[in-house]
Amino acid sequence: VNDTVNQAMSVSIASMRALKEQVKVLDKAIEQHLEIIPNTLTSIPGIGKVYSAGIIAEIGDIHRFNAQASVAKFAGLVWHRNQSGDFEAEHSQMIKSGNRYLRYYLLEAANSVRRCDSEFRRYYDLKLKEVNKYQHKRALALTARKLVRLVFRLLKDNRLYIPPEG
């Protein structure tokens, strides 16, 4: 029984080492591709190489979008409008259409940025306190929408992020 357990453990350890090496190879490949692309997004605290590469890959050419709202709609970070006459619903859901991979990268990047950047942290905290229902999810989606505005402007102007004073 011990031989079987030892053999299974050695196979598992060898598999983990092989996977670790593959991760290193993939990280190097991402870095090589990022050298070609301007590092505008990695200048934002909390956005590393993986999020930056993912966002840029999913957006593609930023010049095909006229406004940040178009990027947000492409990512699916917009809400349904429920209205009839003068009535407009207070609670509405985010649309399910859009590029789900871009939405994932933007939401995860927003979650990371809110931890590293004080302006995004304040914005997240403000949105968190506004409602009682779905607080984190809503605040994170709105923070991601704020991040879309920043990403759009940085990529469009091809410049680095400079955090505001204060």
Stretch-by-stretch model annotation:
Residues V1-G166:
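A detector of single, family-specific signature residues
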